[in-house]
């Protein structure tokens, strides 16, 4: 089944913008970047010229020889056998991180040929630029990032009627109980499946969890193969060590990343490069601790205290080797993992809505709040509870210490607001930006 992705509407808006620049679509491997650009091209253009620098290396030489858009257009026409016209052709440059000269040419398309619709995709673009020191056309391109399929996108694909009910939830009031339970069940299935498009599509078509798991395993394997292909030989073992240890770090109660758990006696300077590579590749999200929750949060982060979450909760479940029915049924055997699974799920949504700079707060052994968000000039603490047990004291301690205008608790309970505390069901986290803006 083809999954409708929200990124298509954003691409359509880019097309209609009279001040558009060449577009770079970023994102981890296997999240659907190439598919999205081709889908956009089919819906909005008469024709597509598709260039993949990984499979068409001969074009690299053409981009090395000239940066003149007219000459490059002619070379692409000859290579593909298709005419390129500004109003009706979408030019897709895929795996652009493989050709630094093509990246640099975007500046000239912006300045000298803005009438052409040029879009690019690169899974390891940040890694490639960091490794090679290549120049980048700063200010001459537009950026978008594609993430794994969100819960809302997943819901739209599996149950159109339930999705319509979900879309109508736009005020702070209790959700009808039957809808609340159905959405909670859908959330649990999303925890298992995650958002890698191929796995989601396969499950929707077959309802076979084993097939979806096999696809997830294949994606994890492809990530590992990328390590060997794109990392300097001396750094490969450390990236493998960090990647292989992530689930163990997250399984601990505090989830704080400890270098010594990767290898006994390990130091930060030995593994910081490996962590940076995984972050640049979009495979992990780094969440830093705060010295104190003050604006701007970035000025108060602790660089030496952080957690690393995966880019997809379904892949995290595979790294834990969790049994599907254990997750769906909420079995007691799942207790020690459901907290981190819920946190990973929430973080993915926060990154999509608010960007990649996320933080958490702790007061040592007294209390810990899973996420602290900066939005609309406010600091919003977010507590994540994987079930209906919301009696923990951490958020209460934070509220007493800092008196935030608004606090959010995410759990499997229904929606309600108690003074400055907004209780949201976990299935509504994709609407976080909407609800925090109206929760005053």
Task: Label the model's feature ranges.
Residues 129-251:
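Interdomain motor-coupling "hinge/lid" segment immediately C-terminal to the ATP-binding subdomain
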Residues 36, 40:
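Hydrophobic positions on the alpha1 helix immediately C-terminal to the Walker A/P-loop
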Residues 201-373:
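Accessory nucleic acid-recognition modules appended to NTPase machines
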Residues 55-87:
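Short glycine-rich substrate-engagement loop in P-loop NTPases that contacts/grips substrate
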Residues 33:
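Conserved lysine of the Walker
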Residues 25:
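Hydrophobic anchor at the beta1->P-loop junction of P-loop NTPases
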Residues 92, 117-123, 145:
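Structural recognition of the conserved hydrophobic beta-strand(s) that form the central parallel beta-sheet
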Residues 1-14:
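N-terminal pre-Walker A segment at the start of P-loop NTPase domains
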């Amino acid at each position: 089944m083809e999954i409708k992705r929200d990124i298509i509407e954003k691409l359509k808006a880019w097309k209609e913008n009279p001040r558009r620049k060449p577009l770079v679509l970023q994102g981890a491997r296997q999240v659907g970047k190439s598919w999205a650009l081709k889908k956009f091209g089919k819906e909005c253009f008469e024709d597509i010229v598709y260039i993949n620098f990984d499979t068409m290396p001969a074009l690299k030489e053409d981009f090395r020889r000239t940066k003149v858009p007219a000459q490059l257009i002619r070379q692409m026409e000859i290579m593909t056998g298709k005419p390129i016209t500004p109003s009706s052709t979408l030019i897709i440059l895929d795996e652009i991180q493989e050709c630094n000269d093509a990246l640099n040419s975007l500046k000239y398309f912006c300045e000298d040929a803005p009438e052409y619709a040029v879009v690019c995709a690169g899974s390891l673009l940040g890694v490639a630029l960091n490794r090679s020191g290549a120049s980048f056309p700063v200010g001459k391109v537009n950026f978008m990032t594609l993430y794994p399929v969100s819960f809302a996108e997943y819901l739209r694909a599996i149950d159109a009627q339930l999705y319509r009910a979900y879309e109508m939830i736009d005020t702070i009031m209790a959700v009808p109980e039957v809808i609340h339970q159905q959405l909670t069940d859908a959330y649990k299935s999303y925890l298992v499946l995650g958002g890698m498009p191929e796995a989601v599509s396969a499950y929707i078509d077959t309802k076979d969890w084993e097939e979806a798991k096999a696809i997830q395993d294949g994606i994890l394997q492809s990530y590992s193969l990328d390590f060997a292909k794109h990392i300097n030989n001396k750094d490969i073992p450390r990236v493998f060590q960090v990647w292989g240890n992530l689930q163990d770090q997250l399984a601990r109660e505090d989830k704080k990343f400890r270098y010594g758990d990767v290898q006994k006696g390990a130091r930060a300077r030995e593994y910081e490069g490996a962590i940076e590579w995984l972050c640049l590749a979009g495979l992990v999200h780094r969440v830093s601790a705060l010295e104190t929750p003050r604006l701007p949060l970035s000025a108060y982060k602790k660089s030496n205290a952080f957690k690393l979450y995966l880019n997809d909760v379904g892949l995290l479940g595979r790294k834990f080797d969790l049994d599907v029915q254990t997750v769906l049924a909420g079995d007691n055997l799942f207790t020690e993992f459901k907290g981190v699974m819920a946190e990973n799920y929430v973080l993915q949504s926060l990154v999509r809505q608010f960007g990649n700079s996320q933080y958490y707060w702790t007061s040592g052994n007294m209390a810990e709040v899973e996420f602290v968000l900066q939005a609309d000039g406010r600091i919003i603490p977010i507590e994540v509870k994987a079930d209906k047990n919301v009696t923990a004291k951490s958020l209460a301690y934070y509220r007493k210490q800092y008196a935030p205008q608004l606090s959010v608790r995410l759990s499997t309970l229904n929606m309600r607001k108690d003074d400055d505390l907004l209780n949201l069901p976990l299935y509504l986290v994709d609407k976080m930006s909407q609800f925090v803006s109206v929760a005053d």
